[in-house]
């Protein structure tokens, strides 16, 4: 079996590529990073380590690398022969990989076996969005192709090693794929197959992503370098846990998850965040605050839905306010957000980026927490 995976970064090698290799696929990584691609072509294997004592490294073999800028025709040929195409490039880059995917699918013969194209991105409906991008580039031709939506979860921190291919990850992983519209399921080890993926995507978004983001933004306020350091602070942990119980109420109300099971899920997530061996930098988790403060993302969306249910999301509002205080000059979105606050004020910034209007109850709740944080900062400095 053959798989083509777009994105030879840490998630691609340490999660998706690893599971595909363990499932029996020959994996070709497609990327524009010369160092990684050349190393893959020369070595044809790499190692994955785990941020936990007593867990051995795994050798991932039968891998290759192709630079899509230098050898686009080769990528097309590989897709034309693939059983599976996956991506882990980031939501904003799906439109960049779509043309090659479209060309490769159109090169397939009508009688060819089905091919599955799965976007393994940190977003809702990633494969459906990728399909739209592929259709906009010329479609799939006569190919027998499926685009099942997926949800993925594994913490892979920023890291540097002498070996450019080595990657270290947490032991936990979750890869959920939707079965709707599939005639059969492609063989992938470690995947959970579900009929309706929406609840699982939102559970992950409103728990893992919400908690991670809040820990990073409050941790940054308190001068913490890593997520595990942040969670050692009583106040950070209190807000994170409180926010996850707020989103937990919402998830139980919407999807009927079992209360005890979800409470255990929350504690498992927090324990993952606390892993000191991950050394997960606050700056990595906090990056791109404009995207994370978007109306359909991990912070504002659950807060709005809780308000619609008559519940004030105080801890979420504090986390949102902390995100509005976040500043990292090396993060362009952080700089843009801070400039907007300086030039137009906090209320206008909330309206522009969070799509929350001045006078809304949620807006006022966030403003109250924003000013509370400002007062708390003054007290810490004095």
UniProtKB/Swiss-Prot annotation:
- What InterPro entries does this protein map onto? 6-PGluconate_DH-like_C_sf (IPR008927), 6PGD_dom2 (IPR013328), Mannitol_1_phos_5_DH (IPR023028), Mannitol_DH (IPR000669), Mannitol_DH_C (IPR013118), Mannitol_DH_CS (IPR023027), Mannitol_DH_N (IPR013131), NAD(P)-bd_dom_sf (IPR036291)
Where do the annotations place NAD(+) binding?
3-14
EC number(s): the record gives 1.1.1.17
Q: Name one GO molecular function term.
A: mannitol-1-phosphate 5-dehydrogenase activity
Q: Name one Pfam family in it.
A: Mannitol_dh_C
Q: Which residues form a coiled coil?
A: none
Record's GO cellular component, any one?
Answer: cytosol
The protein's UniProt keywords, in alphabetical order, are: NAD, Oxidoreductase
Catalyzed reactions: D-mannitol 1-phosphate + NAD(+) = beta-D-fructose 6-phosphate + NADH + H(+)
Q: SUPFAM superfamilies given for it?
A: 6-phosphogluconate dehydrogenase C-terminal domain-like, NAD(P)-binding Rossmann-fold domains
Q: What class of enzyme is it?
A: oxidoreductase
Q: Which HAMAP family match?
A: Mannitol_dehydrog
Q: Which family does it belong to?
A: Belongs to the mannitol dehydrogenase family.
Q: What is the name of this protein?
A: Mannitol-1-phosphate 5-dehydrogenase
The protein's organism comes out as: Exiguobacterium sp. (strain ATCC BAA-1283 / AT1b)
Q: Which gene is this protein's source?
A: mtlD
